[in-house]
Amino acid sequence: MAVKRREFCKLAGVSALALAGGSASAPGAAAEANETDKLIGEPIVGNRWAMVVDLQACRKEEGCRDCIVACHSTHNVPAIDEPKEEVKWIWKEHFAEAFPNQQHEYLAHDLQHEEVLVFCNHCDSPPCTRVCPTQATWKRDDGIVMMDWHRCIGCRYCVAACPYGSRSFNWRDPRPYIDEINADFPTRSRGVVEKCTFCDERLAQGRMPACVEACKDKCLVFGDLEDPGSEVRRLLEKRHAVRRKPGLGTQPEVYYLV
C-alpha cells in the first residue's frame, strides 16, 4: 500500500530524531531551549527611537572609548588603519567639524577643540534611503534606518547622499581585520556599505544598544521620543540640545546636550 504524504513526513521526522540520538523531549534539548530563553528577553519596542548624548558628562572621561569598542566588537567592524578605507559605526570628531553651524567666536575654547561622539543620525527624513536603487537601506516605522547587506550592490549612492559621513564602504574583505569575530552577528563582504543600526538586533532581544550599555557614566541615553515618560523626553525637556546640521532638513534623531 502506498504511504500517504502526511504519514511519510511523520516517519521521516521520527527517523531524523532517532539518527540524531534523541527526541524533542530529551532532557538535553529541553535544557538547551531553556538556556536560549534566558538569553532572549521580551523585545524593546518604541514608536520613535532617539539617542541623547550628554556632552558635558562625556567630556569628563577624556580618551574613553568604551562605547566605540563595544559597538565595533559587537558588530564585527574591521579595524582598518588606512583613513580612506576606514570602516566605522561610531567614532569621534572635533566639535567644529561635527557642528559647523554652531560655531561662533565666543564659543568656549575647550569645546571648539573637544571631540564628540558621532554615528548615524537615523534621520526622520533620510536622504540616503531615497537614492538607494535596490532598497537595501530603508527607514522602519519606529525610525531606525536599516541596512540589508545582501541587497546592497555597492553603488555608494547612499554614501554620497549622507551629509554626516555616517556610512562606510568596504573596499576590501573586512574579515581579516577583525581581531575576534562575534559569531552572533554577521560579517560583511567586500563591496557593501555598512553603518550603525541602533542595535536593532539587540532591541529584538530585549537589550539596549551596545554603546549605551558600555558607557559607565551614562553619557548615552536611548529611548522612545513619543513616550512622555521616557528618559530621552525628560532630558530634552529639561536641558538645551542641538542636532547636527539642522539646516539640511533631515531631522536627525540624535540629540546632543550642551
Positions of PLM-derived features:
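Long, compositionally biased charged/polar accessory segments in the mid-to-C-terminal portions
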Residues: 204-258
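Short, cationic motifs built from Arg/Lys/His that form the positively charged side of catalytic pockets
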Residues: 5-6, 158, 219
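C-terminal segment of N-terminal export signals and the immediately downstream linker at the start
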Residues: 22-60, 247-258
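Ferredoxin-like iron-sulfur electron-transfer modules
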Residues: 42-63, 103-209, 213
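N-terminal secretory signal peptides and thylakoid transit peptides that target proteins
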Residues: 1-19
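Hydrophobic alpha-helical membrane-insertion signals
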Residues: 59, 63-79
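Non-heme iron-sulfur electron-transfer modules
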Residues: 28-40, 73-112, 138-151, 166-192, ...
